[in-house]
Amino acid sequence: MTDWLYRYPPLYTGILLKRYKRFFADVQLTSGEVVTAHCPNTGPMTGVSTLGSAVQLSKSANPKRKLAYTLELIQVHDNEPTWVGVNTALPNQIVKLALAKYLFPELGNYSYIKSEVVYGVDKKSRVDFFLTGSDTERPIYLEVKNTTWTKGTLALFPDTETTRGQKHLRELTALLPQMRSVMLYFINRGDCTEFAPGDSTDPIYGKLLREAIALGLEVLPCRFDVTPEGIRYLGLAKLVI
């Protein structure tokens, strides 16, 4: 394959035995050994943390690290056997690689990409990406949200109430129309074809998202194929509002 945006290091297969204290997961490897892995996703992981699920772990070569293993992938069976990426450190890395390759034509022309730019009324927030460089287009403020919860083939965000996410929507909306504001939902599994706000978990977020769209917020629900080999971009899911 030549279209991988990201290639995983060698991974270790196991079975999820327990997830606890947000950061820890006990996993039985195929060798029979039980290890405690770092869980980089501290959210509820609704629908994707079923005990007994197949998982994939990476292993750090750093001897000083307290937990050598990191939980990277969990296999779900909502539609067909599908790997779901659960390492929340990866989406922003992968989006940055995709931006450098200009894989999102919806964003138009830009030549400058900067990460973690301070913005907001109180200047206490950071947007994931700031894009500029075109003389004819407004600068772009782009926020990335990792998305793993689904109902059938409909991806949903958020999977729990998120006051932080609500704040991000308000701040992106406040930039309009002088700037372009873009919310990119990183659908971290390949079995979804549509996207909608998770109204049942956070109706305020859904309301704010719809209001923001009406005022000019752009939404990119981006589908990614996730396997133990790596991650690649599949295009946009249909936005269901």
Curated annotation (Swiss-Prot):
A GO term, aspect molecular function: DNA binding
Any matching Pfam family: SfsA_N
Listed InterPro entries: SfsA, SfsA_C, SfsA_N
Domain of life: Bacteria
CDD domains (alphabetical): SfsA-like_bacterial
Family: Belongs to the SfsA family.
Protein name, UniProt field: Sugar fermentation stimulation protein homolog
Species whose genome carries this gene: Nostoc sp. (strain PCC 7120 / SAG 25.82 / UTEX 2576)
